[in-house]
Amino acid sequence: MLYWALVFLVVAIIAGALGFGGIAGASAGIAQILFYIFLILLVVSLLFGLFRRAR
């Protein structure tokens, strides 16, 4: 589960760099949406990983 959290972190950083950096002007809105989606998935994966190890 920690593996997926790291994958989501990397994807969120890439999407954020493209969306907020203005590199891809036409797809900036999509990149910003993807940033938030993968950021939420990162947090969910981290929480599941922590609860799974606590048992």
Swiss-Prot record:
UniProt key word Cell membrane: yes
Subcellular location: Cell membrane
Top-level taxon of the source organism: Bacteria
Membrane topology label: Multi-pass membrane protein
Membrane-traversing stretches: 4-24, 30-50
Keyword Repeat: no
This protein's UniProt keywords: Cell membrane, Membrane, Transmembrane, Transmembrane helix
GO cellular component: plasma membrane
Entries under InterPro entries matching the protein: DUF1328
Main subcellular location: membrane
Signal peptide: none
NCBIfam families: PRK13682.1-1, PRK13682.1-3, PRK13682.1-4
Family: Belongs to the UPF0391 family.
Name the UniProt record assigns to this protein: UPF0391 membrane protein Meso_3110
Species the sequence originates in: Chelativorans sp. (strain BNC1)
